[in-house]
């Protein structure tokens, strides 16, 4: 983090630090968590079928229906979602959402600044 980055975060929006971390850590976090998501998705659950296999079969059948005349008439859309990617994206989104909520609280609520460092950094803000 550069000095300029720090100033932009300090003077920025209620989620400026969170956005910085989204930009700087998302790729590394994805690489770290992907195996932890992939493993249970590929684990056999019932009758030797995994969640990933069930999802693949479900999307194949759904896309057949959505691509049919009836599906098109009903306005159904095909699904092109990779389950592993979707779960990973939503997990990171949720994590950063909670971080942003906490950051906003720290910036706007003196009582949320529970450490001397937070008090010093944000004490002169707002």
Question: Residue ranges of each PLM-predicted region?
Answer:
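Mid-length scaffold segments of soluble, non-membrane domains
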Residues: 1-44
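A generic structural signal for ordered alpha-helices
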Residues: 7, 11, 15, 73, ...
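Short, charged low-complexity intrinsically disordered segments located at boundaries
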Residues: 21-26, 67-68, 122-126
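Short, residue-level hotspots on alpha-helical faces of the histone-fold
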Residues: 23, 27, 31, 35, ...
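An amphipathic alpha-helical core segment
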Residues: 36-92
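A cross-kingdom marker for long, charged
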Residues: 84, 90-126
């Amino acid at each position: 983090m550069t000095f300029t980055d720090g100033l932009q975060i300090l003077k920025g929006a209620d989620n400026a630090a969170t956005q910085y971390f989204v930009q700087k850590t998302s790729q590394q976090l994805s690489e770290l968590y992907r195996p932890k998501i992939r493993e249970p998705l590929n684990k056999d659950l019932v009758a030797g079928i995994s969640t990933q296999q069930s999802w693949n079969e479900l999307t194949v059948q759904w896309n057949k229906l959505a691509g049919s005349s009836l599906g098109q008439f009903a306005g159904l859309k095909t699904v092109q979602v990779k389950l592993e990617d979707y779960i990973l994206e939503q997990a990171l989104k949720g994590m950063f959402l909670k971080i942003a909520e906490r950051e906003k609280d720290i910036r706007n609520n003196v009582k949320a600044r529970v450490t001397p460092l937070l008090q010093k950094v944000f004490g002169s803000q707002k």
